[in-house]
Amino acid sequence: AVLAAYGDTGSYQSTAIGTGTALPTVNAQKYPTFVADIDPIQLDEFFGMSLSFNKLKVKQISKFYFVPRSNNIEIYYRSGANSLCLIFGQQAREGIISAATKFIEMQEASTLVDAKPTSANAFYSGACEVFWGVATPANGTTKGSFHANCKFIDGLPYFVLRFPSTLATTSQNTYSPYEELYFSPTQLKFFCEQIQQENLQARVDEVASRAFVY
C-alpha cells in the first residue's frame, strides 16, 4: 500500500491532455480523496529531530512526497533499526497545523506547561498510516494514530508528534515501533507551510500546467 503510487508510470490512463487540468479517472473511485492523476510530487526537505538519552538529534528529511491520487503526504526516514513511512491525509494535516498554531502562540506567550506528554493533554490526536521495516517499510498499519504534544527538553518547549505502537494490518502479531518526531518552533513553521492544502494544490497546478497542455 505504501509504494503503490511509485513505479507505476503508465498504469493510470489520463484523458486530460489539452484540457489544461488533470481530470479524474477511474482512480477517483479507488481514492475518494483523489486530487489529480499525477505521480507523487517531491516536496522540499524539512528538518525534525529525534530524542535519544534526553538529547535531540537533527533529522534532515528529504524523502517527503505529496500523492495527488490519494491526497496524502508520505514521509520516509530511518529511525534506529527501522526504515519508516508516515502517511497523513488532509484531515490529519489540518489537525497538525491547528495544533502547531496553538503551540506557537502559547510558546510566544510563554504559557506552555512543562508536563509529561499524554493523549489527554495533546493539542490534537488523529489518524495516520505507519509502515516500517529494516530495509524498506514492508510492514504496516492503516489504522495508526498520533498525538501532537509539547515536551520540554533542557528547559525549552518542543512540538512532538507521538506515534503509539499499533497492531499491523499487513501481518499478524506484529506491532509498529513507538515513534516520536520533534520540531523546534522554526522547524515547525516550515513543515506546516509545506503541508497546507492550498500549497499542495499549488504544486499540483504547477505540474498540471506543464503536463496537461497541448
Q: How should each PLM-predicted stretch be described?
A:
Residues 2-214:
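Positively charged, low-complexity terminal tracts
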